[in-house]
């Protein structure tokens, strides 16, 4: 259940971070609401996962999910371009997240 909550926390972080891209001052309220709720749910799920998982592992996986997820959305949705070095770095983050999951005792 802790790993499930950690994945949910990562997904909520992605949603909140993408909502930040749409904030343009005071004209649109929905991005601010989505961002606030998203980060709130993300931190709550992360805190619940940290009850069972080591804090360092949980935090590293959470940030990894967020980094890879936001980058993927940027690539697909916003048509952002990446250099080869950035793609390699994201792959290393993914490998680290997978390694932490496979070697975690919880």
Swiss-Prot record:
Residue spans crossing the bilayer:
3-23, 29-49, 50-70, 82-102
User: Keywords assigned by UniProt?
Assistant: Cell membrane, Membrane, Transmembrane, Transmembrane helix, Transport
The record gives the membrane topology as: Multi-pass membrane protein
Coiled-coil region(s) at which residues? none
Write out the GO cellular component annotations. Answer: plasma membrane
Gene3D superfamilies named in the record:
1.10.3730.20
Q: Name one GO molecular function term.
A: transmembrane transporter activity
Q: Which SUPFAM superfamilies match?
A: Multidrug resistance efflux transporter EmrE
Q: Which GO terms describe its biological process?
A: transmembrane transport
The molecule here is called Uncharacterized membrane protein YvdR
Q: Which species is the source of this protein?
A: Bacillus subtilis (strain 168)
Lineage of origin = Bacteria, Bacillati, Bacillota, Bacilli, Bacillales
Gene name of the encoded protein: yvdR
